[in-house]
Amino acid sequence: MNDVTLDDGTIIELKVAHIDDYQNGGYEYLYSWLSKVDQFLAKRYRVADLVKNKEQWLSRLNTNEITLLGLRQGKIIGSATLIMNDPQSRAAHVASFGVAVHPAFQRKGIGKLLISGLEQIALDRGIEKIEVNCYDGNAAAALYRSLNYASEGRRLRKGRLDNGTYVDELLFYKFINPF
């Protein structure tokens, strides 16, 4: 897609993911930092599951999902995936997304850039509504609100953290192509 210079001078390359981005240690690097932030994600990223998770991740590259990457010096430091419904579905006008940014690069605007890029891709594909969720306490909730995502609800005790405590899931939406 393009190179973007952040406020601190860091240059980030934004691009649509390709299988080559995950070769030569690319996926392993991504996985290593996802495992550090997975308490905020719906999926756990444990070292023992790396091979299985890599196979699943790569198999999704040719489905109704489009992933945008943020790269710094060729390393993946941000990832956002747009998940589109089956085109034959009555919910084909709705998509959802997930986003994660390397801990060292959070709060620098990378998440906002990735989400804005996904919104443009969704618009280009005729998507009207985008949904996203996160666990209560995740700083991403403030990011979604700052991008005009509205609250759609809350699922009580939807997630269970590694320490055994439960956390609610917050649901957000945004109409990007209003009817």
Where are these regions (language model features)?
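Acetyl-CoA-dependent GNAT
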Residues: 7-10, 40-93, 98-104, 175-176
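Conserved catalytic-core motifs of GNAT/GCN5-like acyltransferases
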Residues: 131-134, 145, 150-166
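Short glycine/proline-centered loop/turn elements that form peptide/ligand docking sites
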Residues: 111, 115, 137-140, 157-163
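Conserved N-terminal entry element of GNAT/NAT acetyltransferase domains
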Residues: 1-24, 178-179
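Conserved acetyl-CoA-binding loop-helix of GNAT-fold acetyltransferases
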Residues: 101, 107-122, 141-146
